[in-house]
């Protein structure tokens, strides 16, 4: 006799299913430091998808050593600028920022996003942070960066997106010295990641507005007579007779999409600077042409085209990096049908 197993429809892991506060996703943790000092995060804008023909280098795979077709996502990654250094201290409620220093001569477009601090006392503030590190008051050093979408033709905006990135270094002094060296400078994608490495991606998914429970939670459609009584895509009950209120566990209609989603262990298949290598005939739908630096990531990434995608060192890396893949062909066929 078959075992009766009927899991609950949908998942409560992402509840409440409401719109994200911002189109800029957040990383709430950073992995342990490895290697030379560098930023642990980057950001780009989603272009679209295509496929590549590459040699399968997955160990013990049935197609190991054979040519396979792999779907990839193209993300255009113009250089980002380091705007500030922020020092954190731990207290009973967690970490809090205790000091920050802003660079001078930042891009004028940054005023579209925030009131830009003048940074007149940069040398004095840097000295104060150094003293606090020596006194043991600082628990972490991070960098405040922002994107430069004005250099992209596919993203119709000039307003930068500001975010915070961790710094990979063994100790605070090394972090602080590296942060001072890159303060106010441009950082490219090749300064942070290498081809073949694993990364985590975070983005805001495609917004779908208000949807019914069938699409939002994946409930079964009504069967037989029930479906002919005007309730094909509705739930059977809101709860028992004796309840004074409707439980939050009941699948109901509401906001669908525009949620933050983080995906782990995505592999970078290629980092390039010539957009013609990946731009299809007629350009990408709803984006256009890739003209600058870009990355090819294996598989899909949340969000529509032009959406900001954040990249981070893997916080749960399950395997070692496979190295640089052998890509034989990148499809440039038209995506317009």
Swiss-Prot record:
> Any idea which GO molecular function terms this record carries?
rRNA binding; structural constituent of ribosome
What PANTHER family does this protein's entry cite? Answer: 60S RIBOSOMAL PROTEIN L3-RELATED (PTHR11363), LARGE RIBOSOMAL SUBUNIT PROTEIN UL3 (PTHR11363:SF5)
Q: Which family does it belong to?
A: Belongs to the universal ribosomal protein uL3 family.
Self-association or partners: how does it assemble? Part of the 50S ribosomal subunit. Forms a cluster with proteins L14 and L24e.
Disordered, as annotated region: 1-20
NCBIfam families xrefs: L3_arch, PRK04231.1
Protein name per its UniProtKB record: Large ribosomal subunit protein uL3
InterPro entries membership: L3_arc_euk, Ribosomal_L3_dom_3_arc_sf, Ribosomal_uL3, Ribosomal_uL3_arc, Ribosomal_uL3_CS, Transl_B-barrel_sf
HAMAP family tied to this protein: Ribosomal_uL3_A
Function noted in UniProt = One of the primary rRNA binding proteins, it binds directly near the 3'-end of the 23S rRNA, where it nucleates assembly of the 50S subunit.
A single GO cellular-component term from the record reads:
cytosolic large ribosomal subunit
* Listed GO biological process terms: translation
Q: Which Pfam families match?
A: Ribosomal_L3 (PF00297)
Q: Which keywords does the record carry?
A: Ribonucleoprotein, Ribosomal protein, RNA-binding, rRNA-binding
Q: Which Gene3D superfamilies match?
A: 3.30.1430.10, Ribosomal protein L3, domain 3 (4.10.960.10), Translation factors (2.40.30.10)
Q: Per UniProt, what is the name of the gene that codes for the protein in this document?
A: rpl3
């Amino acid at each position: 006799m078959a075992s009766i197993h009927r899991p609950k429809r949908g998942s409560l892991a992402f509840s409440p299913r409401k719109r994200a506060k911002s189109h800029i996703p957040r990383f709430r943790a950073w992995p342990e430091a490895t290697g030379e000092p560098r930023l642990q995060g980057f950001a780009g804008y989603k272009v679209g998808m295509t496929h590549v023909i590459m040699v399968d280098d997955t160990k013990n795979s049935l197609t190991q050593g054979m040519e396979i077709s792999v779907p990839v996502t193209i993300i255009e990654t113009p250089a980002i600028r380091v705007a500030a250094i922020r020092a954190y201290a731990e207290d009973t409620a967690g970490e809090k920022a205790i000091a920050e220093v802003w660079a001078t001569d930042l891009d004028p477009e940054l005023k579209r996003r925030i009131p830009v601090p003048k940074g007149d006392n940069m040398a004095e503030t840097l000295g104060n942070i150094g003293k606090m590190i020596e006194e043991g008051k600082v628990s972490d050093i991070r960098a405040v960066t922002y994107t430069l979408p004005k250099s992209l033709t596919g993203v119709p905006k000039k307003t930068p997106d500001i975010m915070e990135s961790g710094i990979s270094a063994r100790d605070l002094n090394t972090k602080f010295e590296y942060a001072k060296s890159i303060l106010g400078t441009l950082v490219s994608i090749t300064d942070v990641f290498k081809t073949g490495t694993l990364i985590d991606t975070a983005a805001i998914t495609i917004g779908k507005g208000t949807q019914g429970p069938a699409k939002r939670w994946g409930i079964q459609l009504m069967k037989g007579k029930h479906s002919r009584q005007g309730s094909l895509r509705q739930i059977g009950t809101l709860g028992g007779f004796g309840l004074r209120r409707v439980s939050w566990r009941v699948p109901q209609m509401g906001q669908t999409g525009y949620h933050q989603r983080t995906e782990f262990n995505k592999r970078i298949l290629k980092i390039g600077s010539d957009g013609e290598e990946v731009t299809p005939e007629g350009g990408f739908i709803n984006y256009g042409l890739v003209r600058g630096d870009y990355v090819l990531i294996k598989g899909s990434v949340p969000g529509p085209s032009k959406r900001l995608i954040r990249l981070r060192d893997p916080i749960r890396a399950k395997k070692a990096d496979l190295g640089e893949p052998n890509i034989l062909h990148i499809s440039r066929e038209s995506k317009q049908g």
